[in-house]
From Swiss-Prot:
Keywords: Hydrolase
Keyword Ligase: no
Signal peptide range: none
Highest taxon in the source lineage: Bacteria
Statement: the UniProt record of this protein carries the keyword Hydrolase: yes
Organism: Thermotoga maritima (strain ATCC 43589 / DSM 3109 / JCM 10099 / NBRC 100826 / MSB8)
Coiled coil: none
Entry protein name: Acylphosphatase
One function term, GO molecular function aspect: acylphosphatase activity
PANTHER family named among the record's database cross-references: ACYLPHOSPHATASE
Length: 90
């Protein structure tokens, strides 16, 4: 089990990005959460096996049709044992 902190930048708010991310995560068995950030980016904490996370990142980098992803930064982190993938609101 690996865990990643992912920040996605570009036109990623107001375009269905969080719902897209949750759908992709659930289809791949990835756990964690996604949330909008005050700076206009989207933050994702994702946990899963290496292959699932690789596929997840590939899809997130594309985003939904209305999104324009300009940058994706990824950092490994410690798994926290999430049992589902959710959208967090602040």
């Amino acid at each position: 089990m690996k865990a990643l902190k992912i920040r996605v930048e570009g036109i990623v708010q107001g375009v269905g990005f969080r719902y897209f991310t949750r759908r992709v995560a659930k289809s791949l068995g990835v756990k964690g959460y996604v949330m909008n950030m005050d700076d206009g980016s989207v933050f994702i904490h994702a946990e899963g096996d290496e292959n699932a996370l690789r596929r997840f990142l590939n899809e997130v980098a594309k985003g939904p049709p209305a999104a324009v992803v300009t940058n994706v930064s990824v950092e490994e982190t410690t798994p926290e044992g999430y049992e589902d993938f959710t959208i967090k609101y602040y």
